[in-house]
UniProtKB/Swiss-Prot annotation:
Record Gene3D superfamilies: Bira Bifunctional Protein, Domain 2
Gene Ontology MF annotations: ATP binding; magnesium ion binding; phenylalanine-tRNA ligase activity; tRNA binding
Lineage: Bacteria, Pseudomonadati, Pseudomonadota, Gammaproteobacteria, Enterobacterales
Cofactor note (record): Binds 2 magnesium ions per tetramer.
Protein's name in the database: Phenylalanine--tRNA ligase alpha subunit
Primary location: cytoplasm
Class of this enzyme: ligase
InterPro entries named among the record's database cross-references: aa-tRNA-synth_II, aa-tRNA-synth_II/BPL/LPL, Phe-tRNA-synth_IIc_asu, Phe-tRNA_ligase_II_N, Phe_tRNA_ligase_alpha1_bac, Phenylalanyl-tRNA_Synthase, tRNA-bd_arm
Length: 327
């Protein structure tokens, strides 16, 4: 057994002198491996009387356990040293700035809507909204649009059934507002509208904004002044503007507004007019006492003119190369 004690001492000394995990594993194999010094001690048990073998085996196992514990402790120490060394090499400078997050941006049509809302809110206009699934009364009848009008045709309007449709204009919001509120009324109504059309300058869904004023003594002069101020504010230049006579069932007189483009050609930007007396009567407002004006414009159309976009469909394709230009 004195030889066993020497082996344990040698093993512990070898363990302490190991400088890395690989060297430590070599010590383990040398003393505890299949042919290790301590493992081979078990073969000497056959030379002992049967009654002495259990006690001798226990002593050998105890020696192996001591060496194994020494191996485990040394391995933990070496791994800790290695970890600390690696962490020291991987030190993070917390004073460095973090990774830059790419900022998003508003869609160009959203920019246009917010810009227009901001302008008209300064003039006392409130923002009004309404349902996109509309009935034929609010979308057509109340607006003085007769049954034979082309806008009611299936090829222009998305109908659900005989009376329900996807609104073709936000004018229904004006009707609902006038039904629920007595003059004076001053609103703008932005929102999505739907028409059965798709090409370079038309999409089945687009954004429209309409404006409405109803009060006493409202004249066409008020309409012209308001739209002159708006267009010059929106395009940020002293534009040449003209009002061209037109026809809309819900206004009388009616006009379309053009601005002079950089190429010397007139560009249509919106439609407008004085609210038709029939429309006022349909919502219970006396046209002998009150008058008003209304205007409507496509948000995509104005956005195209402001930013020089040539294809309306680009606004709906979610191409980041296009959208990032407006950040």
């Amino acid at each position: 057994m004195s030889h066993l004690a020497e082996l344990v001492a040698q093993a512990k000394a070898a363990v302490e002198s190991a400088q890395d995990v690989a060297a430590l594993d070599s010590v383990r194999v040398e003393f505890l491996g299949k042919k290790g010094h301590l493992t081979l001690q078990m073969t000497s048990l056959r030379n002992l009387p049967a009654e002495e073998r259990p006690a001798a085996g226990a002593v050998i196992n105890q020696a192996k356990q001591e060496v194994q514990e020494a191996l485990n402790a040394r391995k933990a120490a070496l791994e800790s040293v290695a970890l600390n060394a690696r962490l020291a090499e991987e030190t993070i400078d917390v004073s460095l700035p973090g990774r830059r997050m790419e900022n998003g941006g508003l869609h160009p049509v959203t920019r246009t809507i917010e810009r227009i809302e901001s302008f008209f809110s300064e003039l006392g206009f409130a923002v009004a909204t309404g349902p996109e699934i509309e009935d034929d009364y609010h979308n057509f009848d109340a607006l003085n649009i007769p049954a034979h009008h082309p806008a009611r045709a299936d090829h222009d309007t998305f109908w659900f059934d005989a009376t329900r449709l996807l609104r073709t204009q936000t004018s229904g919001v004006q009707i609902r507002t006038m039904q629920q509120q007595q003059p004076p009324i001053r609103i703008i109504a932005p929102g999505r509208v739907y028409r059965n059309d798709y090409d370079q300058t038309h999409t089945p869904m687009f954004h429209q904004m309409e404006g409405l004023i109803v009060d006493k003594d409202i004249s066409f002069t008020n309409l012209k002044g308001t739209l002159h101020d708006f267009l010059r504010n929106f395009f940020e230049q002293d534009l040449q503007i003209r009002f061209r006579p037109s026809y809309f069932p819900f206004t009388e007189p009616s006009a379309e507004v053009d601005v002079m483009g950089k190429n010397g050609k007139w560009l249509e930007v919106l439609g407008c007019g004085m609210v038709h007396p029939n429309v006022l009567r349909n919502v219970g407002i006396d046209p002998q006492v009150y008058s008003g004006f209304a205007f409507g414009m496509g948000m995509e159309r104005l956005t195209m003119l402001r930013y020089g976009v040539t294809d309306l469909r680009a606004f709906f394709e979610n191409d980041l190369r296009f959208l990032k230009q407006f950040k």
